[in-house]
Every structure is written in C-alpha cells, then in structure tokens.
Design a protein with these regions (language model features):
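Bacterial Sec-dependent N-terminal signal peptides
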Residues: 1-28
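Post-HEXXH active-site segment of zinc metalloproteases
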Residues: 139, 154-182
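Active-site recognition of the HExxH zinc-binding catalytic motif
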Residues: 143-156
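Long, well-structured alpha-helical subdomains associated
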Residues: 177, 190-238
C-alpha cells in the first residue's frame, strides 16, 4: 500500500499543480448586468426607517452599532448580495476597513453557506483616526462601505483555490493589487452610489482633518485607490 501511495503522489501533485495553474484570476471588478437604483447625491439629514431597510437587505446582514443606517443603505445597493451572509463588525485592531471571508465556509460545497465579514476598526488613538468610519460624514460612510461590499461581490464569484491565488497575487504583485482596488472603487458607481464614494475620496484627501494624513500617505493612496477627480470623471462616463 505504501508503494502505491508513493507512486501516486507525483501524479496527484501534478494534477493539483495543473488545476491551480489553470485557474485564471483577473484583478478587475465586473460591472453588474442590471440597472442600479440611482441614489440621491446627498443621503445625509434624511429620515430613514431601519425596519424598512432591513426588509430590503434581508435578515442575514449584520449591522455595526452606531452605523446601522449607513450600512443598511450600502447593503441595499447590492441586490446580488441579498442571499449572502455578511456581517459588519467593529473591532479595535487591523486596517481601517477590511472585507474578509470565513475560510472554512469557503470549503463547503456551493455558495449558500459562505460567510463574509467587513471589519471596521473603531479603536481609540490610532494613526489613521481621520479616516475611521466614525470620523467620516454620513455620505462618505455609505461610500466606503459600498466599496467594501464590492470586494465581497468579487470574492463570491471565486472558488476556494481561486481565492488562494487571488490572495497571493494581491500581496505580491503591486499592479494586480492596484487594479483590483481601483476597480473596486468603481463598484459604488456601478451600484448607484457614485456621489458617496466620490465624497469619501474627496474627504480623505481634502478635508482639513485629513490633510496631514493624506500628505503622509499620498503615494500609496493615489496609486492603489482612485482620486476624487478620477472618480468624478468615471461618474460622468457612467
């Protein structure tokens, strides 16, 4: 039996290698094939009924405490995610915002059991305080949450092997990383929240509270994410 296993191992390794290499992963986001609801340019200072929003987004969506309305509006822009389990969680560590997936749920057959999380750093006295969700105006909050949901749309189209390849390319190939993030910035535009992602990009670059932060990270931000001017140009084309 051991000899058979030894003889089969190179064959199995070859099959696995070929399978992995055959997975073609592109970094670009894809424009949805439906006409989105076009949200107003300004969503702040309106009366919202959270229960009505929950009825639209489904009961499988977690809402972060204190940001329920902004999160629910962002969810509502993504009808393709209505049946997908997603939680938005406040945390005290990590990046300012990060879309993530439960790796074990990715191993299950089909996609109905997959679980995703959007981690929202809410720690005190971080070096990126100016761009934390709590520091942003309401429309900018909706815009950046819509960006994070765009990542989940992308993840949900991949299988387990593809997710692994994507992650490896994301952290090792700058061009892949940049294309993915910059086209994810387009997802709010594609889902009717162009004004909101524009307001986010404008705020984190132009608001007095963010100027110092932006100047220190300008090269990174403008390489991997669209500027407000670039987003405005895209909005005019869409």
């Amino acid at each position: 039996m051991k000899r058979i296993i030894i003889k089969l191992s190179p064959v199995l390794l070859l099959v696995i290698t070929v399978t992995v290499m055959a997975q073609r992963i592109v970094p670009q986001q894809v424009k949805p094939d439906f006409d989105p609801y076009q949200f107003p340019d300004t969503l702040a200072h309106r009366n919202y009924d959270l229960d009505s929003l929950k009825a639209v987004i489904g009961d499988n969506k977690g809402l972060p405490k204190g940001f329920e309305i902004a999160a629910a509006i962002a969810y509502s822009a993504y009808p393709e995610l209505k049946d997908v389990n997603i939680d938005m969680v406040l945390t005290d560590k990590g990046a300012p915002m990060e879309a993530n997936f439960n790796i074990w749920s990715m191993l299950l057959p089909g996609k109905k059991n997959r679980k995703y999380k959007i981690l929202l750093n809410n720690a005190d006295k971080t070096w990126f305080d100016p761009i934390l969700l709590r520091s942003l105006p309401f429309d900018a909050q909706v815009g950046i949450l819509a960006h994070e949901l765009g990542h989940i749309v992308y993840y949900h189209e991949l299988n387990f092997v593809q997710i692994g390849i994507w992650g490896l390319k994301y952290v090792t190939k700058d061009e892949f990383h940049a294309i993915h993030e910059r086209t994810t910035d387009l997802m709010p535009i594609y889902h009717g929240l162009g004004s909101q992602i524009y307001q986010y990009a404008y705020y984190v670059r132009k608001d007095p509270s963010c100027v110092s932060f932006y100047e220190n990270g300008k090269d990174f931000m403008d390489t991997y994410y669209m500027t407000d001017e670039e987003l405005l140009a895209e909005m005019k084309q869409n």
